[in-house]
Amino acid sequence: MKQLISRRSFMKAAGVTTAVAAVSLGAPAASACFPGSVKDITILYTNDVHTYIDKKSPELTYAAIAALKKSYQDAGKDVLLVDAGDHIQGTAYGSMDEGASIIQLMNAAGYDVATPGNHEFDYGMARAKEAMAEADFPYLSSNWVNLPLGNRVLPDVKYFTIGGRVIAFVGITTPETFTKSTPAYFMDKSQSRYIYDILG
């Protein structure tokens, strides 16, 4: 019960973590650009859902999350829905189709942005990239890199103009992903060298 209350509190209190940081960029400048139109912004946040989507926790289903977001929108509120990772793995719901159904549910719920957690890599590198491509929302990571190419695998930041402000979400994948997942997934097919890394 303690865990359920904690997650519910995070949802309603619009918390953010270091994995997905919400920053108001240049608030005075934004106010000048949108005089008289600066409003409160609600950020709904989930993480470590681990495919627990059954009715044992009805207030935490994706249908409930979608309804919560819609309730803010229907009230004329500015709202964004974000996830900080570890959502496609954890129960049989995820393993049956390697997270495809979870991504579909997140699409239907109206997520705006997400960052990959260490468990997004549990089905292998190819599936991790494929699952993220199935999302209608962008995934962000400033420190997941392709070593041979010397660039990021995903965008590092997403900007939203909302509530009279410019809001930036910066994605950071936990560096422990490299060891908490399967290191071989970050190597080439011959497992002779690493081609991906999560920089710390």
Q: Which residues fall in each region the model found?
A:
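C-terminal segment of classical bacterial N-terminal signal peptides
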Residues: S24-A29
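Acidic, metal/ion-coordinating pockets
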Residues: K2-G15, A19, S31-G200
